[in-house]
A protein has these predicted regions:
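Peripheral terminal and linker regions in Fe-S/redox and tRNA-modifying enzymes
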Residues: 4, 21-369
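Long, distal/terminal scaffolding or interaction modules
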Residues: 9-12
Length: 369
């Protein structure tokens, strides 16, 4: 499925205006649009739609040489060593056998290993280490990690919760757990030597921490009252489970989507209450009926950050419920292939949508599903 067609035409169809433009304005437009300028614009658009990444041996996706100028530091870390090799090539066991001092001494630069560990859901709070010299209470954070899981729709079993509690309890005062705004678990106080055993334990109870941080698809969010909401339109749990299984290849790690330009959020809306906050998700599935068939309208591009808050926009497309995964795949491939990788403040998917809309005023062309 060619991703260049997935986001190639984001703008809705141009609508003929009944308002008559002033003569001077009409003449200016006519003079500006010539065959030469049309050809130039088409050439720019065609070049821009060339995928910027390519698949390499082992299934890893790598940024092409010609697109590496001006990339951000995180992209340089990914180029230097594939983060998922920590899992697929058992690199985490090698790291776990080293002291933090040995790990720090082996770094190419101060953030490389800390960044790559986020693909395993491990977050080392480096800034606290700098403060620890002045504040002894913060020194405990050195060598300790927060571990973020994947918990689609926020559904957890008693067995899973007991296991996480046992992990946290083992760290005494340094251990604690968070419930996140994306319906997820985070456990704190984890030390690197314990990680291989913790990951094995997660697998035994049906959990994973893979692809939960950095430039990956984050935890799929659904209705927190799924299955018991009296105003429920659709039970979101089957769909969020499907999305999580697809994104992580059933917790084995899905290399097709471990090198996105930035993080990517997805949700499935279950009721009119909009608990899932679809307006701030990169892809939101909005339940609706069309011609007697259940499916979803799509919203895309929503996010908020200190630099910009962008509300998701309607894709003006309806998909049947059977196509939830193919649509997600097509949009992720397009974002992976076409998204910019320079200024981290301008690499979320909405920036790509803005750019592609400026190239086209045609209607959306979804790939064959």
């Amino acid at each position: 499925m060619a991703s260049s067609t997935s986001l190639q035409h984001f703008a809705p169809p141009a609508r003929a205006s009944t308002r008559r433009e002033p003569a001077r304005r009409r003449l200016t437009v006519m003079a500006a649009v010539t065959p030469a300028t049309e050809a130039a614009a088409a050439g720019v658009a065609e070049e821009r739609l060339e995928p910027r990444v390519e698949e390499r041996e082992g299934g890893y996706w790598v940024l092409k040489e010609k697109y590496r100028e001006g990339i951000n530091p995180q992209e340089k870390v990914k180029l230097a060593k594939e983060p998922m090799s920590l899992v697929l090539e058992d690199g985490i066991r090698d790291l776990a056998a080293k002291s933090m001092e040995e790990i720090d001494a082996s770094k190419v630069h101060k953030d490389d290993i800390d960044v790559r560990l986020k693909w395993l859901g491990l977050f080392h709070r480096r800034k606290h280490q700098c403060e620890s010299l002045r504040s002894p209470s913060l020194y405990r954070s050195y060598g300790r990690f927060m571990m973020r899981l994947k918990l689609p729709n926020g559904v957890t079993t008693s067995e899973q919760t007991r296991y996480l509690a046992s992990v946290v309890e083992g760290y005494g005062k340094d251990g604690c757990a968070d419930v996140t705004t994306r319906q997820n678990w985070q456990i704190r106080g984890v030390t690197l030597p314990d990680v291989p055993a913790i990951m094995q334990g997660l697998d035994r109870v049906g959990l994973t921490s893979l692809q939960s941080g950095m430039d990956n698809v984050r935890n799929p969010v659904g209705n927190p009252l799924a299955g018991i909401d009296p105003h429920e339109i659709v039970d979101t749990r089957p769909y969020t489970n499907l999305l999580s299984a697809f994104v992580t290849a059933n917790s084995r790690g899905n290399l097709a989507f471990t090198n996105l330009p930035r993080k990517w959020n997805v949700c499935v809306v279950g009721s009119h209450d909009l608990y899932e906050h679809p307006h701030i998700n990169d892809l939101a599935y909005m339940p609706t009926i069309k011609d007697g068939r259940f499916g979803f309208n799509l919203l895309v591009g929503g996010f908020f950050s200190p630099k910009r808050c962008a509300e998701a926009v309607p894709l003006d497309a309806w998909v049947p419920s059977d196509d939830v995964i193919p649509v997600c795949k097509a949009i992720l491939e397009a974002y992976r292939d076409l998204g910019t990788r320079g200024n981290r403040q301008k690499t979320r998917m909405m920036w790509l949508i803005d750019e592609l809309v400026s190239f086209s005023s045609s209607s959306l062309l979804l790939p064959d599903l």
